[in-house]
A protein has these predicted regions:
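Structured beta-strand/loop patches that form or line metal/cofactor-binding pockets in enzymes
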Residues: 1-33, 37, 44, 328-335, ...
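Metal-dependent enolase-superfamily TIM-barrel catalytic cores that perform enediolate-based chemistry
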Residues: 117-239
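Conserved, mostly hydrophobic/aromatic
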Residues: 3, 29, 52, 90, ...
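Glycine-rich, aromatic-flanked loop segments that form ligand/cofactor-binding clefts
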Residues: 91-132
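Shared catalytic-loop signature of beta/alpha-barrel
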Residues: 23, 47, 52, 66, ...
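Metal- or metallocofactor-binding catalytic centers and their adjacent structured scaffolds
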Residues: 26-102
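Extended hydrophobic packing segments that form well-structured cores
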Residues: 355-387
Length: 387
């Protein structure tokens, strides 16, 4: 079996563009799909997929590990979010082909089932965070939280923290507590609520937020400070009684290594579309296991990336919970046939071979790449603010 072509297919998804990787083999009808979506870098990642294709055409797609090593090691410059997103989508497509060729769901090649269902959580913002978060209204937060729980979810995540300066006053902390209080009152104590700080805060501010939110029992506090300083993250983790989660902007096991060694979090959140694909996601999870760190994969992307994460979750012992986007664009199901059987906030194991997805390329063409919104956020004094 040989790879004949590797191409990128771009679909507009409003807040971002989905970047799908299509891998065609010389076997009639045997096509692999993956996802390399990375926010606000669409043209860059498409180019990275095209560059990688030169290393793949003519190769046997069943040599998944060998081809991962070729793409990672034989181009001298390693890592980086754009290149690793391209490798991630390609790696997913390789696994899809291999499992389809054998006629089994992908999780069977990843060690088989270690659980019979995968717990999911929804994000309060769905696929359009600005629509929910810009006015930061407590009643809107409560209404949206009740709607999510009404659909059977037993866990949800909120972004309750405003864009924060280096050392702000009490306004932001009061706002976060007010919003979290409204959500907790709306859903009760039996629903887990995670709070995302989105890397907006310094360690000093993150500690203030954490202590203020602790009585409301967040399940975990996500990305309390930007990536790049693991010692600062570890400082936050030691100072708070709330488990810390991080990792959505980290790629490869090499960037997760220091986080684990410094005991900087209780939950890691690698993204199957960024970190290096399914191959690297499994390695990162295995690294985390002896540190008693669980894995809650980051997943605000498209339906193919979601299926990759589901197969990972079904086959990984230290998996915790899976993020899904339930309300990004109404044409999601039109573009990708994604066989998710969801019951009471859980998804059951898919039964189709491979990842289990089918892409309607004609539908995808109707929703081709669109302009992504420009993230231009500033503090009142005009200084740049983090998204």
């Amino acid at each position: 079996m040989k790879i004949e072509s590797v191409t990128a297919l771009v679909v507009n998804a409003r807040q971002r563009n989905w970047v799908f990787v299509k891998m065609v083999t010389d076997q009639p009808g045997l096509i692999g799909w993956g996802e390399a979506t990375i926010e606000w870098n669409t043209r860059a990642v498409v180019g990275a997929v095209e560059d990688a294709a030169d290393f793949l055409v003519g190769e046997d797609p069943r040599r998944t590990e060998h081809l991962w090593q070729v793409l990672y090691r034989q181009r001298f410059f390693r890592g980086g979010a754009v290149v690793m997103s391209a490798i991630s989508g390609i790696d997913q497509a390789l696994h899809d082909i291999k499992a389809k060729d054998l006629g089994v769901p992908l999780y069977q090649l990843l060690g088989g089932l270690v659980r019979d269902r995968v717990r999911l959580y929804d994000h309060l913002g769905g696929g359009d965070t600005d629509a929910v978060y810009n006015d930061a209204a407590a009643d809107r937060f409560a209404e949206r939280a009740r709607e999510i729980v009404g659909r059977g979810f037993t866990a949800l995540k909120i972004l309750a923290v405003p864009r924060t300066g280096m050392l702000d006053g009490v306004y932001g902390v009061r706002q976060a507590v007010g919003l979290m209080s409204a959500v907790r009152e709306a859903v009760g104590d039996d629903v887990e609520v995670m709070v995302d700080l989105h890397g907006r805060t310094t360690p000093a501010m993150a500690i203030q937020y954490g202590h203020a939110l602790a009585p409301l029992r967040p399940w975990f506090l996500e990305e309390p400070c930007p990536p790049g300083n693991v010692a600062a993250l570890a400082e936050v983790a030691r100072a708070l009684p709330i488990p810390i989660a991080t990792g959505e902007r980290l790629v490869t096991r090499y960037e997760f290594r220091e986080v684990l060694e410094q005991r900087a979090c209780a939950v890691i959140q690698p993204d199957a579309c960024h970190c290096g694909g399914i191959s690297e996601l499994k390695r990162i999870a295995a690294m985390a296991e002896p540190y008693f760190v669980s894995v809650a994969p980051h997943n605000p992307v498209g339906p193919i990336g979601t299926m990759a994460a589901i197969h990972f979750a079904l086959s990984t012992p230290n998996f915790l919970i899976q993020e899904v986007m339930s309300a990004d664009v109404p044409w999601r199901a039109e573009v990708v046939d994604q066989p998710l059987e969801i019951y009471q906030g859980h998804v059951l194991p898919p039964t189709r071979p491979g990842l289990g997805v089918e892409v309607d390329e004609r539908a995808a063409a109707r929703y081709a790449q669109g302009p992504e919104p420009k993230l231009r956020y500033f503090h009142p004094d005009g200084a740049v603010a983090d998204w």
